[in-house]
Design a protein with these regions (language model features):
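Short acidic, glycine/serine/threonine-rich helix-capping segments at coil-helix boundaries
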Residues: 29-71
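Sec-exported extracytoplasmic/periplasmic mature domains
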Residues: 51-55, 70-74, 103-107, 120-124, ...
């Protein structure tokens, strides 16, 4: 019965908040949340996600929310975040920055869609300043130990976006523009070519979402030089 589950979920959320500042796990697969989150029929967005875990319903990403967004299963996240309007204000601001960097470099909308897909899969546009998976940080979950830059550079969303796109940046890794023939590749495959994830098939699930997000936020996103 739900009356017996809420206290357990609240304790789970509090514990998750403490974990966000702890050392990263020793494996690439993030630990799943302790129990599935029940969802009210038709409920979407960050507030619904927080409510399902017994968190304060603020519509903003606090420490506990960030941890659970990182570990919740994709099937659950696709339900809560079915449309760009389901993202919170901070998440949308980061998405506009990703778009703005692409616009500032006069990159195509397709390049911007691919960057949005990668960030949505990796972080749901949460700028992680404490590592959850190994030393992965920022909206693209880039790793200092893998040559993506310093923690300060990776958690600076414009710099992280430039690294993903392959624009001049502190990164020693190839970005989108360095992937030969990326324009003719499937968008999810381009994400994987840049990110080199242990789960290469997960990017494609966000393609429609990313296209809708670009249509919603792109017109108001200022170019970022």
């Amino acid at each position: 019965m739900r009356t017996n589950r809420l206290p357990h979920r609240l304790l789970t959320a509090v514990a998750a908040g403490l974990l966000l500042t702890a050392a990263a796990p020793a494996h690439a697969d993030p630990a799943p949340p302790p129990s599935p989150a029940p969802q009210a029929s038709g409920a979407h967005g960050l507030r619904a996600f927080q409510q399902s875990y017994g968190l304060p319903v603020t519509g903003r990403v606090d420490t506990a929310t960030a941890q659970l967004l990182r570990t919740a299963p994709d099937s659950e996240l696709r339900t809560f975040f079915a449309a760009p309007s389901d993202l919170g204000p901070e998440q949308l601001a980061h998405a506009r920055t990703v778009i703005g960097v692409g616009k500032g470099a006069e990159l195509s909308e397709e390049a911007q869609v691919i960057a949005l897909m990668a960030a949505m899969q990796e972080s749901k546009f949460v700028n992680y300043t404490s590592a959850v998976d190994h030393d992965s940080l920022g909206v693209f979950q880039q790793r200092p130990s893998m040559g993506w830059g310093t923690p300060a550079q990776i958690t600076h969303v414009p710099t992280a976006s430039k690294s993903f796109y392959g624009l001049p940046s502190p990164s020693a890794n190839p970005g989108l523009l360095q992937i030969d023939g990326w324009e003719s590749m499937e968008p999810g495959d381009v994400c994987q070519a840049v990110q080199r994830s242990a789960y290469p098939d997960r990017y494609a699930q966000w393609e429609d979402f990313a296209r809708d997000l670009l249509a919603q936020e792109g017109p108001d996103a200022d170019p970022v030089p």
